[in-house]
Amino acid sequence: SITSLEGEKVDKLFFRDEALANKAKNYLKSNSFFIRKIDERTISRKPKAPFNTSTLQQTANSQLNFSASQTMTIAQGLYMGIDINKETIALITYMRTDSITLSKDSIDTIRENISKEYGDKYLPDKPIEYKSRKKNAQEAHEAIRPTDISIKPDDIKDFLNEEQFKLYDLIWKRTIASQMTSAETNQSTLQIDCEEKNITLKAILGKLI
């Protein structure tokens, strides 16, 4: 990303017209660049909570480009059941909920799956508990999760349409990740200058440990 142009700091609103954008583009094409400084650090990212209705809609919109109503329609189908090997199987729990909590039984099953499939390296010493910050949250239901965490998305891909697969995959991965250890990332920040000193850049590279 560009951090400065002709000595002026660049922020999100900097490129207010096409002329500025073209100027930056020309500098990028005509200059020779070199790395001035490298900063390295380790970042720990805690897992996100399981989905409730609003976070499922938001994430499906940002990652899958599904509208809120589209997400709920697909989720309804997964909740009502999918025909798999001549049997109708409900794949997710009730999709209208404010809750981000999971039952003890489901947490135990998820942790067993993590240990078996990924190894104890990715399993915290204790279960991770999530509580809603929203006052008066309707928590009669659990968070949205697969009814059977052992049913992997790829195992049932042939029985789902494309949209169903994408949403189930999203829910399954979020549920598994919610009970895993924090992700450790080695992050390198590169400060990049040019010989003409009319534009500076920053690049951030990350690698999971």
What is each residue range found by the language model?
Residues 1-209:
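Core catalytic DNA strand-manipulation module of type IA topoisomerases
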